[in-house]
């Protein structure tokens, strides 16, 4: 990820997507924010030769990534806020934007993000955690692996729900992390 051009070829995506992938890997503490090399955790999980879950197949890895994002108030503010401060069971993206904006206005010392940034952040939150509800999922529609955790559910075109429930697939090792 040091060289944008070679990363686009290696990953087969555009420069904007490479930058997005880099951002989320930093937010999940998988790469170092200074040199973009894998952190110890990134190597432990995803190293192709010795990693515990190089293909992101273990449910425990998804839970760990969720926790790392949800506890990162600086780089994943909307995710952290949603899972620690927002407790409404049913909502739409507009309600989330308004609630997040209000929270940021009350709690942030620095400048509040623009409305377009809030809209984008809430859209990312929904795409990360809610499965696409389509009768037939198109080839070009890929859900985020985090949607497998069942933390946010899509209802209709813009409605969502999130309720507290037992998650028997949450490994005790992740709780102890």
Residue ranges and their predicted role:
Residues 1-177:
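Donor-sugar nucleotide-binding helix/loop cap in glycosyltransferases
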């Amino acid at each position: 990820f040091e060289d944008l051009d070679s990363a686009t070829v290696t990953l087969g995506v555009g420069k904007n997507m490479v930058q997005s992938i880099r951002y989320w890997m930093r937010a999940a503490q998988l790469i170092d924010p200074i040199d973009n090399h894998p952190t110890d955790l990134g190597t432990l999980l995803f190293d192709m030769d010795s990693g515990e879950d190089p293909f992101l197949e273990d449910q425990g890895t998804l839970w760990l990534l969720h926790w790392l994002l949800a506890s990162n108030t600086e780089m994943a503010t909307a995710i952290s806020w949603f899972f620690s401060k927002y407790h409404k069971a049913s909502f739409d993206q507009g309600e989330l934007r308004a609630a997040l904006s209000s929270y940021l206005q009350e709690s942030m010392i620095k400048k509040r993000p623009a409305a377009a940034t809030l809209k984008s952040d809430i859209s990312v939150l929904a795409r990360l955690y809610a499965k696409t509800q389509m009768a037939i999922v198109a080839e070009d529609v890929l859900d985020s692996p985090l949607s497998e955790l069942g933390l946010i559910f899509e209802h209709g075109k813009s409605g969502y729900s999130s309720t507290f429930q037992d998650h028997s697939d949450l490994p005790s090792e992740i709780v102890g992390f």
